Amino acid sequence: MTSPALKDPAKTRVIVGMSGGVDSSVSALLLMEQGYQVEGLFMKNWEEDDGTEYCTAREDLADAQAVCDRIGIKLHTANFAAEYWDNVFEHFLEEYKAGRTPNPDILCNREIKFKAFLDYALSLGADLIATGHYVRRRDTGAVTELLKGLDPNKDQSYFLHAVGGKEIARTLFPVGELEKPEVRAIAEKHGLATAKKKDSTGICFIGERRFSDFLKQYLPAQPGEIQTTEGEVIGRHHGLMYHTIGQRQGLGIGGLKDAGDEPWYVLHKDLTRNVLVVGQGNEHPWLFSRALLASEIFWVNPIDLSSPRTLTAKVRYRQSDQRCTLALTESGYRAVFDEPQRAVTPGQSVVFYDGEVCLGGGVIETAEPWSPRA
């Protein structure tokens, strides 16, 4: 089967997901220059905070419209707030209730940007969609692979690992072959309103507010004890959901007699007892894992795991590739690392690579300690 991307650009209608940022703006411009029939689409995925200081949707829509007006393309708008609530946000809350630390951006990409948006674009008569993600695609016969973005500082394949090959085959990634400074320079050269706009950071629906303030609107806090690894009570937490493995800030521990000056870190969340276990030192042994179990694995394309495979993996965004051996066991997918991994966090994602190819990944269920715990 020939990939849709291999058609004549002049006969190919592409709808670009316009976020109001510089990356999607330049993506639309580049596709225009390549001869595609280009239109834009602005997605509204969150409605809870309309009219508040935290919601930037109006500003983002205005920026997207300004860019579309500048380059002379039509801008569609679509409201996917209901789909986002049902397929992303409710899962986000359930994970926090379970004491885990989820990554909603990964689910948003799979369920909204490469499902709801793709379906909507196809219903408008599009042949392909495009986004401003820093990833690349490679077509090999009937198979479309997801590759890391050329800019190692901006590569976003970690966040797109749960998107299937069929969806990738329907998508163009114009800035994936560029580095960020090049993208801004192109936007500046063409007078795009988003040329100097700051990149968005953090979880989209939280904005600039404190995470704990946001979360307590939806989940009741359950305060409990903070204990050392020896079981000594040294403080109280406001709720396990506010903390993640490896966290240093916001523990409220200080001035303890004979404790020394080394900072305290979250080592473990004991969900059964509602206890936050902490220890001192960035290199505390409890922070390191030798292996992990993952579930809910999504492969971009099916892979053969009839025998263990040596791959590389990331257990967090921006982490360098870590060599591991992946095997399918009765308990799930088990990755054993060559080197100890710090702060492996249940609920976060582990993403597997073969060189520059992103194979897929899944949710971390448990981490196995690097050294035995008493």
Curated annotation (Swiss-Prot):
| Known catalytic reactions | S-sulfanyl-L-cysteinyl-[protein] + uridine(34) in tRNA + AH2 + ATP = 2-thiouridine(34) in tRNA + L-cysteinyl-[protein] + A + AMP + diphosphate + H(+)
Question: Which amino acids does the record list as binding ATP?
Answer: G17, M18, S19, G20, G21, V22, D23, S24, M43, G132
Q: Name one GO cellular component term.
A: cytoplasm
Active-site residues annotated for this sequence: C108 (nucleophile), C204 (cysteine persulfide intermediate)
Q: What is its EC number?
A: 2.8.1.13
Q: Where is this region: Interaction with tRNA?
A: 154-156, 316-317
Query: What superkingdom heads the lineage?
Result: Bacteria
Q: Name one GO molecular function term.
A: tRNA-uridine 2-sulfurtransferase activity
Q: Where in the cell is it found?
A: Cytoplasm
Where is it mostly found? cytoplasm
Any one of the GO BP annotations: tRNA wobble position uridine thiolation
**Annotated site residue numbers, Interaction with tRNA:** H133, Q348
Q: What does this protein do?
A: Catalyzes the 2-thiolation of uridine at the wobble position (U34) of tRNA, leading to the formation of s(2)U34.
Q: What's the family?
A: Belongs to the MnmA/TRMU family.
Please give the name of this protein. Answer: tRNA-specific 2-thiouridylase MnmA
Q: Which species is the source of this protein?
A: Pseudomonas putida (strain W619)
